[in-house]
Amino acid sequence: MNIVLIDSRQTTKDVWKISASRQVEHLKTHVNVQVGDTLRVGVKAGKRYLTEVVAVEEQLVMVRPLHEEVVPAKLSVTLIIAMPRPKVLRRLIMDSVTLGVEKIILLHSYRVDKSYWQSPFLQQLDQYVNLGLEQAGDTIAPQIEIYK
């Protein structure tokens, strides 16, 4: 995780709350975040900020924005692929988002197994996009189109 991606509803005051359990656990165990440390925080579909940690609690990390950072420009790349196997789809979406692809189109072809379209992985695309955005340090998700 190269940035912490939060929803705009978490940024209503001078102090922002990072409350997603996955993010809080990562910050505490892997980053070993302490009060006074700086973190890169991005607002979904918005801007990216350098922030200072003001409080670390059991299920919550609170940060204060210091200044705005430049969000990297998207590559003007459209990735068109036939629906892959579900586990490959997860990796493909995360890696494509990390690379900065602007648009992803998933197609059906005669070689695609119809069961792939009923996979629970399709319901979790937003989670994989968020993981890719956090890895890339980006805040703007690519457009994903699905044609069966």
Q: What residues fall within each predicted segment?
A:
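N-terminal positively charged helical leader segments and presequences
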Residues: 1-69
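RNA substrate-binding interface of SAM-dependent RNA methyltransferases
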Residues: 70-148
